[in-house]
Swiss-Prot record:
One of its GO terms (biological process) is pollen tube guidance. GO terms for molecular function: thioredoxin-disulfide reductase (NADPH) activity. Signal peptide: none annotated. Belongs to the nucleoredoxin family. The keyword Repeat applies. It catalyses: [protein]-dithiol + NAD(+) = [protein]-disulfide + NADH + H(+); [protein]-dithiol + NADP(+) = [protein]-disulfide + NADPH + H(+). This is Probable nucleoredoxin 1. It is an enzyme of class 1 (oxidoreductase). It comes from Arabidopsis thaliana (Mouse-ear cress).
Length: 578
């Protein structure tokens, strides 16, 4: 905020009139065409709302802002001015009709552009709070409104500090009642619509479930969570779940909630967003555990329930230590067959469609390739992997690769797999879910390596293939150390720093970089770069040390700042003394 504040509030700062007016206009407009003098805003806090009809996030945020505006405008001096980013007047008009506040006329593009530049608007929705003198009060209005609503008025740094201090006090003094009870509500609801007093939940272990029914990860957790909840009830444990739905559609909330066995806050309860802040919600689904005393026992046990089910209860530190030991034992006992055999599913597919028994792969180094045709980085990486696979196979190594698809249909799977020379898990195979969980696949492409015993060697094999190609085989820590020693030997006589005409601002320092793009030849490089960390600038050793006076002028490179780089011979990514 400091830079924008300095520009807006500095010595050359404008008052509200000059901020919102133009030489030909001293008014703003309402959506019915009424003109409102800018000077009538004196004494009010103003929100400048940069938004546009074509922007989906804007369309979703505007109703929230309308609610806050309606609550504040009738009680305190607060006004909003819409600064449109629409591309035509019709779109502006249609969108503006949803807003109860003022706007800079669409025809005054000069003022709209000036405000964009003054407040450094680089994305929308953007809500900037100013006072009646035009001075910047808060440039994060969207985040403030989403988090605190009207409670944040007058949006000043002092008010934001006060809110933060109140939140800290609430966390320190947390009880079940402070979490779930509001001045207007002392109950939660059951799926049949009955009110359940919060007092009936006191003394129990409580799970607060933050969820959105339409979100895939929430949907995937639900069956396991229902099973977990049902088993605890059968065991007569003092445990309850309270759903805090972040749905914005009441029908979706009702359709989802009526099929669940647990309790919930009423739809659109304003304490939902407050609780999301209170527990510093960062992901969905989140299941916060409160102990019988109402204090937070664990910030999110969703993954623990997904992995261990009822074994994770009651989520104490001692229980998690037990689970850690179980996981360690599971990892140590891992074999290829424990990963890939599930009931009758004891095979993978060969290129001819034949079933290849998992038992026939035991004792080999295996790469597990999580990928999909719809994923551009996957399509870019696969040809490189095909090349490396063939090179390793030509050496008659005990090696194989298995494709684990995230494609969306059989046709896409077949088309993508036709480009691959290796094995595959059948499309839609249920083993994919357990493999993705075991290797914690958060994104694709991902390449995990298993050693001959079936133990995981690395989950970062993709980086090793990109950096070292077939030389990375068998992808072990020992092999990586051998490669690094080789490159250290190659680079031991290279200058540690150079100056180059393509980057005269700073010296370039010899740096170990896994993968980069050379800023001279624009080709990929690995391992060693002449690098400027401040500017994120990289040169291959050959590009930094090879003289090319025709391209770069005389004395293109000075080693150590003074000495010529004569005497170096560079081939590929390697430079050696002549």
């Amino acid at each position: 905020m400091a830079e924008t504040s300095k520009q807006v509030n500095g010595d050359d700062a404008q008052d509200l009139h000059s901020l919102l007016s133009s030489p030909a206009r001293d008014f703003l407009v309402r959506n019915d065409g009424e003109q409102v003098k800018v000077d009538s805003l004196l004494g009010k806090k103003i929100g400048l709302y940069f938004s546009a009809a074509w922007c989906g996030p804007c369309q979703r945020f505007t109703p929230q802002l309308v609610e806050v505006y309606n609550e504040l405008s009738s009680k305190v001096g607060f006004e909003i001015v819409f600064v449109s980013g629409d591309e035509d007047e019709e779109s502006f008009g249609d969108y503006f009709r949803k807003m109860p506040w003022l706007a800079v006329p669409f025809t005054d593009s000069e003022t709209r552009d000036r405000l964009d530049e003054l407040f450094k608007v680089r994305g929308i929705p953007n809500l900037v709070m100013v006072d009646d003198h035009g001075k910047l009060v808060n440039e994060n209005g969207v985040g403030v409104i989403r988090s605190y609503g009207a409670d944040a008025y007058p949006f000043t740094p002092e008010k934001m500090k006060e809110i933060k201090e109140d939140e800290d006090r609430a966390r320190r003094g947390q009880t079940l009642r402070s979490v779930l009870v509001t001045p207007s509500r002392d109950f939660v609801i059951s799926p049949d619509g009955n009110k359940v007093p919060v007092s009936e939940l006191e003394g129990k272990t409580i799970g607060l479930l933050f969820s959105v029914a339409s979100y895939r990860k929430c949907t995937e957790l639900t069956p396991k969570l229902v099973e977990f909840y049902t088993k605890l009830k059968e065991n007569k444990e003092d445990f309850e779940i309270v759903l805090i739905s972040l749905e914005d559609d009441e029908e979706s909330f009702n359709q989802d909630f009526k099929t669940k066995p647990w309790l919930a806050l009423p739809f659109n309860d304003k304490s939902g967003s407050k609780l999301a802040r209170h527990f510093m919600l960062s992901t969905l689904p989140t299941l916060v555990i409160l102990g019988p005393d109402g204090k937070t026992r664990h910030s999110n046990v969703a993954e623990a329930i997904d992995d261990y089910g009822v074994l994770a209860y009651p989520f104490t530190p001692e229980k998690f230590q037990e689970l850690k030991e179980l996981e360690k034992a599971k990892v140590e006992a891992q074999t290829l067959e424990s990963l890939l055999v599930s009931g009758d599913l004891n095979y993978v597919l060969g290129k001819d469609g034949a079933k290849v028994l998992v038992s026939d792969l035991v004792g080999k180094t295996i790469l597990m390739y999580f990928s999909a045709h719809w994923c551009p980085p996957c399509r870019a990486f696969t040809p490189k992997l095909v090349e490396v696979y063939k090179q390793i196979k030509e050496r008659n190594e005990a090696f194989e690769l298995i494709f684990i698809s995230s494609d969306r249909d059989q046709e896409s799977f077949d088309e993508y797999y036709s480009q691959m020379p290796w094995l595959a898990l059948p499309f839609g195979d249920p083993r994919k879910a357990s493999l993705a969980k075991t290797f914690k696949v958060g994104g694709i492409p991902m390449l995990a390596a298993l050693g001959p015993t079936g133990q995981t060697v690395t989950k970062e094999a993709r980086d090793l293939v990109v950096a070292h190609g077939a030389d990375a085989y068998p992808f072990t820590e020992e092999r990586l150390k051998e490669i690094e020693a080789k490159y250290d030997e190659i680079a031991k006589d290279w200058p540690k720093k150079v100056k180059h005409v393509l980057h005269e601002e700073h010296e370039l320092e010899l740096t170990r970089v896994q993968v980069y793009t050379c800023d001279k030849c624009e080709e990929e490089g690995t391992i060693w770069s002449y690098h400027c960390d401040e500017c994120d600038f990289d040169l291959h050793a050959k590009c930094a040390l090879n003289e090319d006076t025709k391209e770069n002028g005389d004395e293109a490179v000075k080693v150590g700042g003074d000495e010529s780089k004569d005497g170096w011979v560079c081939e590929g990514n390697v430079c050696t003394k002549a």
